[in-house]
């Protein structure tokens, strides 16, 4: 029986099908490494839309979307870093906190939009040239038809709350 187990383990290891190869990376380790790399890029190249896109898309890859049931409790940036799990507002806060941690010099806002599918949180970033860009907090693309009929409920930053007129 021992020899059969050894043969199976050997085959799995040789073929690359060993479960150890499928273990997900620790998002905390990946995140710390990414922060260091982004800091180097900011120092070398400065801020630009491609770097902001890279940072936000990397945050989405590190985050695991988990729909909350019952009361909707928002995680802080530091709470999110404990397990990298949350729903749309937690992931938006994570992206916001990441850009703040990196010293992003332009305005950042969290925005709640009302859409046909329900309320949704996104990150708004003032780009280096002054225009605003919305970053979705889930990997599922927003339908343009839904965006067209959506409306902002509220948005805010560290200092102010903005209501639509």
Enumerate the language-model features and the residues they cover.
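Sec-dependent N-terminal signal peptides
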Residues: 4-14
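A structural boundary/capping signal
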Residues: 16-165
């Amino acid at each position: 029986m021992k020899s059969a187990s050894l043969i199976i383990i050997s085959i799995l290891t040789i073929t690359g099908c060993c479960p150890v190869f499928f273990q997900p990376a620790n998002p905390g380790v990946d995140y710390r490494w990414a922060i260091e790399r982004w800091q180097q890029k900011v120092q070398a190249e400065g801020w630009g839309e491609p770097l902001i896109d890279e940072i936000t898309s990397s945050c989405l890859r590190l985050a695991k979307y988990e729909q909350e049931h019952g009361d909707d409790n928002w995680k802080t940036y530091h709470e999110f870093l404990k397990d990298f799990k949350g729903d749309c507002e937690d992931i938006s806060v994570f992206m916001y906190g990441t850009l703040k941690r990196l010293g992003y010099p332009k305005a950042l806002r969290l925005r709640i939009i009302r859409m046909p599918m329900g309320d949704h949180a996104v990150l708004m970033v003032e780009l280096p040239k002054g225009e605003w860009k919305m970053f979705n907090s889930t990997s599922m693309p927003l339908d343009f038809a839904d965006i067209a009929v959506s409306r902002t409920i509220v948005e805010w930053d560290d200092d102010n709350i903005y209501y639509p007129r």
